[in-house]
Amino acid sequence: MAKSVREVLNRAFEGLPTYRATFADLNAPSGLVVTLKGAIGMVIRVKTVHVDVPAANQTPLMIRKYSTAESGGTPGTAGQRVPLDSNSAAARATLAVYTAAATAGTLIGEVFEDDIFTVDNDAYRGDRVHEEFGKGDGCESLILRTAAETMGIVLGAGSNPLNGYIEWTEEPAVADPTPNI
């Protein structure tokens, strides 16, 4: 069903329901360590992935998109999925963290890769990733359109501790959200 002009204008002024989930002091292994899974009937738009490592580690970090969910691994304690507006419904996307790496699903592609945690003149700088998707003219967010689609954070080497957050929006999937004008 097409949205009314009022619904379109409200979205422009109020925005979409936005959520944030944190992970802190995660003793992360090498491999797939954090995932955000899509939800049935929802469009999940990943807006920000922030990762901070306070300890000195040479750890390549990758953000990848998968068409199927991960399997196995040892789950850790995921942070609560918090709506940024208390009037928003509970989040439908699912965050998972792993203390033993999960087996990745079917890779669609890599959207970020960098050897970010570096030592400079034998003094650790305390590096971080703050990757924002959908910023700029015409740019899209990292979008999960099915319950099977997953965004994952992959480490090339173990990291202890690993801290950060993922921020995303959720909206019902519709064939064409353009109003009939």
Cite the ranges covered by each PLM segment.
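C-terminal interaction-tip segments
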Residues: 3-45, 52-83, 138-181
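Extended, solvent-exposed segments with strong compositional bias
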Residues: 88-141
